[in-house]
Amino acid sequence: MGCNQSKSANDVRGNKVNNVNSKKKNNKREDINDGEEIAINPGMYVRKKEGKIGESYFKVRKLGSGAYGEVLLCKEKNGHSEKAIKVIKKSQFDKGRYNDDNKNIEKFHEEIYNEISLLKSLDHPNIIKLFDVFEDKKYFYLVTEFYEGGELFEQIINRHKFDECDAANIMKQILSGICYLHKHNIVHRDIKPENILLENKNSLLNIKIVDFGLSSFFSKDYKLRDRLGTAYYIAPEVLKKKYNEKCDVWSCGVIMYILLCGYPPFGGQNDQDIIKKVEKGKYYFDFNDWKNISDEAKELIKLMLTYDYNKRCTAEEALNSRWIKKYANNINKSDQKTLCGALSNMRKFEGSQKLAQAAILFIGSKLTTLEERKELTDIFKKLDKNGDGQLDKKELIEGYNVLRNFKNELGELKNVEEEVDNILKEVDFDKNGYIEYSEFISVCMDKQILFSEERLRRAFNLFDTDKSGKITKEELANVIIRGFYFFTYSLFGLTSVSEKTWNDVLGEADQNKDNMIDFDEFVSMMHKICDNKPF
């Protein structure tokens, strides 16, 4: 379930956990005490919930089961949305991975906490979204988004093989997610079609990487040494217990091979037979099965299935291969209206109010549905040219240029670069120099959808922790700081940010100057951040 690492890798984790949200090299560390700058991110809202899970959700049906427990489809009691809840038995540890029985349960629980900490840090359109965590005497409960489309594995069984366009769109999404993980120093270690879910059965354009139970933080200075994974997809260096993050790239190469011809490159009657073939690393492109497949596809497979992982391509290189660029979807004229609306909403957004930032990010990342996010998610992925799950300045400028080519109605912009700089200043909530997926969704979505009374009330209640109908600076500090420190640190770290800073945050919305924010003031603040700039 978790990451049973060597000592050296565990040492690395201590340095990586606090930096897991630093999105690209040379980014400054996310730190709420850095120059009194409060950085806002969606991981703040994933927390260990108090009370019994049955008070918040009721069971609809069982979705599946595994070695560590089961996955249930549940519905919110106070809402309408469905969630998938992973139920993990605290007593279900893998005894084969530990020698000292007295340490088994403690080690297993540590792995669960590691998985939770890892999941809460991730913000990518092709990676599963974690909402809440519950815990009782017998179980851990991980509340995640529900994807009704089932496993990619089922699609492979039903369709046997895919044409190159469909295969490229699938691989682009998988590689984008893997590229994002690797840039955050995370290796998945169990990429396979069973761990790729579809949002719905009717489309291959929105898939999700799931099951981070074997995932681990990594460092360029240390090699991973645990033999983990699934026979068909495991990399040869993992069998030798000396590997790095490129083991995920090998697994992607195996998946791509299967998508295009319908069978794996390394087959066998049982796991032992398969592993023997993986150890040799020899595979073939049978002429009859591959004669109509492009040379670009075969070349990419060769790069991903390079036996020597030091010479194997990276996930980013695979994502930017000729095959992906040629066969996967790009922005077209049908996307013009959505893209124009997205850029318009970003231009109008005023992001100086920290409480408003936190509230809109909570609504956009935690309360919106897959269907509501669908069009914007597609646009985000198409704007994200390098596929790293973030929009940089260059990609935003290219988005404007695409609209210019379509003779859009966005209006004449004299200085696109200056416009993009302003957008980054306002929309980059976590201050890392890029626009993340949830930041994009939250700011770009139609505010009539985003700001329903129910959603505004739920956002207000998030901060009004004592349910008094007023938000105080103590409640703000509790929610913000508690969001940064999960399972590890004190929930009451008011000294981490100065009293003046909290007063300033409160004062941004406190119209009657009573040092508290009521619901009407909260609603007024939310509308102002989106309406105070002319379009």
Swiss-Prot record:
Motif (J domain interacts with the EF-hand domains): 353-363
Membrane topology category: Lipid-anchor
S-palmitoyl cysteine: lipidated positions: C3
Domain Protein kinase: 57-324
EC number(s) on file: 2.7.11.1
Phosphoserine: residues bearing it: S65, S117, S216, S219, S334
Record-linked Pfam families: EF-hand_7, Pkinase
PROSITE patterns: EF_HAND_1, EF_HAND_2, PROTEIN_KINASE_ATP, PROTEIN_KINASE_DOM, PROTEIN_KINASE_ST
Cofactor(s) in the UniProt record: Mg(2+)
Motif J domain autoinhibitory motif: chain residues: 345-352
Annotated Ca(2+) 3 binding sites: D464, D466, S468, K470, E475
Residues with lipid group (N-myristoyl glycine): G2
Post-translational modification comment from the UniProt entry: Myristoylated. Myristoylation and palmitoylation are required for the localization to the parasitophorous vacuole membrane.
Disulfide cysteine pairs (residue numbers): none
Region annotation (J domain) ranges: 345-363
Protein's job: Calcium-dependent protein kinase which acts as a sensor and effector of intracellular Ca(2+) levels probably in part downstream of cGMP-activated PKG kinase. During the liver stage, involved in sporozoite motility and thus in sporozoite invasion of host hepatocytes, probably together with CDPK4 and CDPK5. In the mosquito midgut and during the last stage of male gamete exflagellation, may play a role in the rupture of the host erythrocyte membrane.
Protein name, UniProt field: Calcium-dependent protein kinase 1
Organism: Plasmodium yoelii yoelii
